Amino acid sequence: MKTIIALSYILCLVFAQKLPGNDNSTATLCLGHHAVPNGTLVKTITNDQIEVTNATELVQSSSTGRICDSPHRILDGKNCTLIDALLGDPHCDGFQNKEWDLFVERSKAYSNCYPYDVPDYASLRSLVASSGTLEFINEDFNWTGVAQSGESYACKRGSVKSFFSRLNWLHESEYKYPALNVTMPNNGKFDKLYIWGVHHPSTDREQTNLYVRASGRVTVSTKRSQQTVIPNIGSRPWVRGLSSRISIYWTIVKPGDILLINSTGNLIAPRGYFKIRTGKSSIMRSDAPIGTCSSECITPNGSIPNDKPFQNVNRITYGACPRYVKQNTLKLATGMRNVPEKQTRGIFGAIAGFIENGWEGMVNGWYGFRHQNSEGTGQAADLKSTQAAIDQINGKLNRLIEKTNEKFHQIEKEFSEVEGRIQDLEKYVEDTKIDLWSYNAELLVALENQHTIDLTDSEMNKLFEKTRKQLRENAEDMGNGCFKIYHKCDNACIGSIRNGTYDHDVYRDEALNNRFQIKGVELKSGYKDWILWISFAISCFLLCVVLLGFIMWACQKGNIRCNICI
């Protein structure tokens, strides 16, 4: 009897294997998308944190630590400031007639000549820096009646006393200093920059010893401007053994204009002019070393790549640079929404589609197919839908860079102490611009991320609809991104569905017949396999009970004899 019961139960299990889902006359085809075990969190318009399969960092947060010498021409100021090089400080003679794209001033730079001040220092520095050259042309000024080329022990060239090489210190000759009236026309086709100065003696005695008169006067004029300076005689803090000073001024003479110099003393005269050019050159204060490398973007911290649309290394930049923002990180989604693959698929090892989760390990594409048929299981990527999504996403980063990279941004804005209010206003404007750009950057990236996720979801839906239209009534949508195909569909058949050559008419009759042969109601729950197994197990148990009851009834009636041997 035990043998009979066991055989009955085994028979039930054998019949159980003939489930519709595992019948050779049907197949399952699922559509899915790429997934990774650990995705990247990005921000969208509707969600602060959403996980995607891949994302690109948009904020450059570090520099190379050195200033690249290419493609920009970098001039290292070393121990010289730009103004000292302009005036011709003896220890800056090596900078005469030099050219640059970016002049790098060092914190160790110092002056080593007659102590001076420049009332409009920032403007002169900016003007010369943007010109990009120290090209100097000597001119023959007629300084009749005075001695030229004054010198000072505070300004030594080698071991002998000297003076600024681009300036001519005029002083008395034979205790005479006549009034000077000199003109110099600009017959060229470019602007000329003249540097001149006024000497402020420390005592009245020094004044008369050098210029005879108790008080001098200097007036420099053009058709467009006039400057008059009266020396201020008096002692000042001692610098390099001197308590007197020189004030440096500058005048631009346009083509066709005339430079007119009138003086009755204290004039530090020009020896010629500097050519003024219009260009993209500039100046930067930095102690970063200059290295042999190539980078379009330079900051005081060093060069940085410009392959990202934003940077937070330094707000001061030169060249084609990413836009400065306050954020440390902004991530652009370059992949689809990530739904990690579940580890279990039920008792039958069933496959699942994109509605349930993504597929890990699909390296050949973002979208693809998995199938289960009489020949086994398989997987293949759909390259067309993958490429359609990639083509639209790849251009995002380049478009962001084009929108945000600044070409030769004004890197430094300086003002004298007198212009403190203007400086405060400028700082406020710059800070406001940075705040706005930081907000715009975050909003722009969130919009792009939202579009990327919507785009990749749309491509998945397009592929699903394309497949559904091919299969028509030959298959049933299982509701999880899969189709149950009601006809025998080998690997060649599956391949025709993937490449769009499937002919549903060929399989239509077979699919309809198989639909009618399937008994019962197919459950749509995720626990379908479990319920089917439990149902068959209960059925087999009841069958065994009925069979056992029949045997016992037959034994009672004498129709069956049961011998028990011990």
Swiss-Prot record:
Glycosylated residues, chain numbering: 24, 38, 54, 79, 142, 181, 262, 301, 499
Extracellular face of the membrane: 17-530
Residue spans crossing the bilayer: 531-551
Chief location: virion
Modification after translation: Palmitoylated.
UniProt signal peptide: 1-16
SUPFAM superfamilies the record matches: Influenza hemagglutinin (stalk), Viral protein domain
Origin: domain of life: Viruses
Lipid group attachment sites (S-palmitoyl cysteine): 555, 562, 565
Membrane topology: Single-pass type I membrane protein
A Pfam cross-reference name: Hemagglutinin
GO molecular function list: host cell surface receptor binding
Key words, A-Z: Clathrin- and caveolin-independent endocytosis of virus by host, Clathrin-mediated endocytosis of virus by host, Disulfide bond, Fusion of virus membrane with host endosomal membrane, Fusion of virus membrane with host membrane, Glycoprotein, Hemagglutinin, Host cell membrane, Host membrane, Host-virus interaction, Lipoprotein, Membrane, Palmitate, Signal, Transmembrane, Transmembrane helix, Viral attachment to host cell, Viral envelope protein, Viral penetration into host cytoplasm, Virion, Virus endocytosis by host, Virus entry into host cell
Disulfide bonds: 30-482, 68-293, 80-92, 113-155, 297-321, 489-493
GO cellular component: host cell plasma membrane; membrane; viral envelope; virion membrane
Protein function: Binds to sialic acid-containing receptors on the cell surface, bringing about the attachment of the virus particle to the cell. This attachment induces virion internalization either through clathrin-dependent endocytosis or through clathrin- and caveolin-independent pathway. Plays a major role in the determination of host range restriction and virulence. Class I viral fusion protein. Responsible for penetration of the virus into the cell cytoplasm by mediating the fusion of the membrane of the endocytosed virus particle with the endosomal membrane.
SUBUNIT field: Homotrimer of disulfide-linked HA1-HA2.
Protein name as annotated: Hemagglutinin
Organism: Influenza A virus (strain A/Beijing/353/1989 H3N2)
